[in-house]
Amino acid sequence: MNIIEGNLHLNGDEKVAIINGRFNHIITDRLVEGAKDAFLRHGGKEENLDLILVPGAFEIPMALEKVLSSGKWDAVCCVGAVIRGSTPHFDYVSAETTKGIANVTLKYGKPVTFGVLTVDSIEQAIERAGSKAGNKGFEAMTSVVELLNLYKNIKA
């Protein structure tokens, strides 16, 4: 049996975008830093990394649609933070953001990762943005690197 997988090294010519829903920016800024760190550590060049800012997580899917339809980027890492409050707003935003990102990803067939935190408390968000539970932005970008290489290997 042949095993096809992606490695964790970029050639340096890959163009990647980070789309950041900046609401809860104290958290999302840390996710962006983690994503940038992963991109550079795995061989990406800073001039090939773009940060696209949108107001919040709900706006990420439309920005993703615009980014992928432009053909300028090879992959996208989506980050944001939706924190549960006392109203159903959390449920609507997290569900529609997730569905929107998934639908756009399937439409274009390019590597897109979901680094949007959907958490019950600010404490959980802090843990996932570089504290006890690691940095989910770093993890999402590491998955971008792996998927870029996997998709190249599948085409070869």
Swiss-Prot record:
Reactions mediated catalytically: (2S)-2-hydroxy-3-oxobutyl phosphate + 5-amino-6-(D-ribitylamino)uracil = 6,7-dimethyl-8-(1-D-ribityl)lumazine + phosphate + 2 H2O + H(+)
Q: What class of enzyme is it?
A: transferase
Keyword Transferase listed: yes
Q: Which Gene3D superfamilies match?
A: Lumazine/riboflavin synthase
Q: Per UniProt, where does (2S)-2-hydroxy-3-oxobutyl phosphate bind?
A: S86, T87, R128
- Please state the pathway this protein functions in, per its UniProt record: Cofactor biosynthesis; riboflavin biosynthesis; riboflavin from 2-hydroxy-3-oxobutyl phosphate and 5-amino-6-(D-ribitylamino)uracil: step 1/2
> What one GO molecular function would you report for this record?
6,7-dimethyl-8-ribityllumazine synthase activity
Q: What Enzyme Commission number does this protein have?
A: 2.5.1.78
What CDD domains does the entry give?
A: Lumazine_synthase-I
Is this entry keyworded Ribosomal protein?
A: no
Locate the residues binding 5-amino-6-(D-ribitylamino)uracil.
F23, A57, F58, E59, A81, V82, I83, F114
Task: List the InterPro entries hit by this protein, alphabetically.
Answer: LS, LS/RS, LS/RS_sf
Q: Which UniProt keywords apply?
A: Riboflavin biosynthesis, Transferase
Pfam families, per the entry:
DMRL_synthase (PF00885)
UniProt GO cellular component terms: cytosol; riboflavin synthase complex
Give the residues annotated as active site.
H89 (proton donor)
Q: Which GO terms describe its biological process?
A: riboflavin biosynthetic process
Q: What does this protein do?
A: Catalyzes the formation of 6,7-dimethyl-8-ribityllumazine by condensation of 5-amino-6-(D-ribitylamino)uracil with 3,4-dihydroxy-2-butanone 4-phosphate. This is the penultimate step in the biosynthesis of riboflavin.
For this chain, the family text in UniProt reads: Belongs to the DMRL synthase family.
Q: What is this protein called?
A: 6,7-dimethyl-8-ribityllumazine synthase
* Species per Swiss-Prot/TrEMBL record: Campylobacter fetus subsp. fetus (strain 82-40)
